[in-house]
């Protein structure tokens, strides 16, 4: 087999493998970005960069939409059919539409500002392994505190705008590698007293705009500079992340029906310490 073909097939394999990693870690509170940075390092592979990582998140975004398609359809239909000019939105699902929109504003605004005014962000020390390790440890402690002090008595019907604003601000911290978008939003929701499984579902739903938009922006930017043959590995990564995301979402929701999140606290703590000791 010619060396060029062998190298190309290996790139496709890496994209497939990293797509699985992306999908599985996107919806667990352990940071997909951190794992997409650390796993290639452990295997001695080149870092495929921010654009690749963001692009294959599209598979995860499509997975959320597919998994929650019935609830999303209900949310959209309720939003456009239940508005009362004198009373506003009283239906739970129509309010959830507003909440998803509000929670998405901070991360989209800050993400745009970083892209416009911090062009070298992808090469900054914040994406280094040391920063990821420290962030992982800090986030594990915050998640532990949310388990200890969160009342966990709120369902979707009890969620208010204040809860969502705090969750949206927390979500913007996910712009920094190692934070974990699902992890920090879950932590915020637990601190607000939201029940675990409801908190996870809310975390997944509010992530749809941010994950979708960032993925599309980076994918379109890659389309402008890459040939069709170079895009194929990215498409492979998107597809594999879709299927692993479906598995991870279902697994996590079932897990939270009977368990707390302390296993992820221990994992993130160990993950951070492992990185620090292997730098």
Curated annotation (Swiss-Prot):
Uppermost EC category: hydrolase
Residues annotated as transmembrane: 10-30, 48-68, 96-116, 128-148, 203-223, 229-249, 259-279
One CC-aspect GO term: plasma membrane
Pfam families associated with the record: BacA
Catalytically driven reaction(s): di-trans,octa-cis-undecaprenyl diphosphate + H2O = di-trans,octa-cis-undecaprenyl phosphate + phosphate + H(+)
Domain of life: Bacteria
GO molecular function terms attached to this record: undecaprenyl-diphosphatase activity
Role summary: Catalyzes the dephosphorylation of undecaprenyl diphosphate (UPP). Confers resistance to bacitracin.
Note, other: Bacitracin is thought to be involved in the inhibition of peptidoglycan synthesis by sequestering undecaprenyl diphosphate, thereby reducing the pool of lipid carrier available.
Protein name: Undecaprenyl-diphosphatase
Organism: Prochlorococcus marinus (strain NATL1A)
């Amino acid at each position: 087999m010619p060396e060029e073909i062998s190298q190309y097939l290996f790139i496709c394999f890496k994209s497939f493998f990293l797509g699985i990693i992306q999908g599985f870690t996107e919806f667990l509170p352990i940071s997909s970005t951190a794992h997409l940075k650390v796993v290639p390092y452990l295997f001695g592979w080149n870092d495929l960069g921010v654009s690749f990582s963001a692009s294959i998140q599209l598979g995860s975004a499509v997975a959320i939409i597919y998994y929650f398609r019935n609830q999303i359809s209900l949310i959209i239909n309720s939003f456009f059919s239940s508005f009362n000019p004198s009373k506003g939105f009283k239906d739970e699902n129509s309010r959830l539409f507003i909440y998803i929109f509000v929670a998405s504003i901070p991360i989209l605004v800050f993400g745009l500002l970083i892209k416009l005014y911090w062009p070298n962000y992808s090469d900054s020390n914040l994406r280094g392994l040391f920063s990821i390790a420290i962030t992982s440890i800090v986030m594990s402690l915050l998640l532990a505190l949310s388990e200890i002090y969160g009342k966990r008595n709120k369902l979707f019907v009890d969620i208010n705008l204040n809860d969502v604003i705090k969750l949206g601000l927390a979500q913007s911290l996910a712009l920094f590698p190692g934070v974990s978008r699902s992890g920090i939003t879950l932590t915020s929701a637990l601190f607000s007293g939201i029940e675990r499984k409801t908190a996870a579902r809310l975390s997944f739903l509010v992530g749809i705009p941010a994950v979708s938009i960032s993925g599309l922006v980076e994918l379109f930017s890659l389309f402008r500079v890459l040939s069709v043959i170079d895009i194929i590995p990215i498409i492979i990564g998107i597809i594999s992340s879709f299927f692993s995301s479906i598995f991870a979402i279902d697994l996590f929701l079932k897990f939270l029906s009977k368990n707390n999140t302390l296993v992820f606290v221990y994992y993130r703590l160990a993950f951070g310490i492992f990185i620090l000791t292997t730098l």
